Amino acid sequence: MGKIFFLGLLSICIFLVFFFYKQKVNNVIYNKIVEKFEDNVFIDETYTYLFKDSNLKELVFIKSQLIVPEFENKNMMKATGYLADAYRALSTVYKFDFKVHDNKILGFKSVIFEGFEDARVSKHENNLPGEKWQQLKDFNIGDPNVNEKFFHLEFPFVVKNTLCVTISKRFFKKIKKLKRLKIVLISNEDREYKIDIENFLPKYNL
């Protein structure tokens, strides 16, 4: 009887340790996908921060890598031209996805990273590959009016809006040095969605 009681108590303790560890880790949910096609490799790593009690539901940081062995040699990496430039631009991509729930389709006309108010922002489509995309400044928020004809509509269900912000490698290095991520999203209706969280990016090998 005593042995059974001890084993039961041990099981409860193990469950509690797992539960609290899981909760702590779940502040940022990590996911990694590796896809191979022929000799090429595509790696997609996502870091998801969940918000509570807000229309802003998730901040997702995404690092995507494309590895093409024939392009990895030194001569190719120093080459010029569309193909070489495109590969250098696409080999590692950093972006934030902001997920906002509403009963309307939203557009976002501005994104402000506190501390970098003078950052150079572009507003073109995030189509890949493309000459405009390769000329990425500090970050790109896409065309805020791409769904303008739907802005006036209200729906009887939740609309899951996603704002994709692609950031340059140079700008990513600057963001990684911050202690906190303070970001403001401004919608087409001038509504502000404010983020102020601990910067989790330095904790990972990015």
From Swiss-Prot:
The keyword Cytoplasm appears for this protein: no
GO cellular component: cell outer membrane
Main location: membrane
Record-linked Pfam families: BPTA
Localization per record: Cell outer membrane
UniProt signal peptide: 1-19
Keyword terms of this UniProt record: Cell outer membrane, Membrane, Signal, Virulence
Top-rank lineage group of the source organism: Bacteria
Family statement drawn from the similarity comment of this UniProt entry: Belongs to the BptA family.
Function: Virulence-associated protein essential for survival of the bacterium within the tick host and therefore within the natural life cycle of the spirochete.
Protein name in the entry: Protein BptA
Taxonomic source organism: Borrelia andersonii
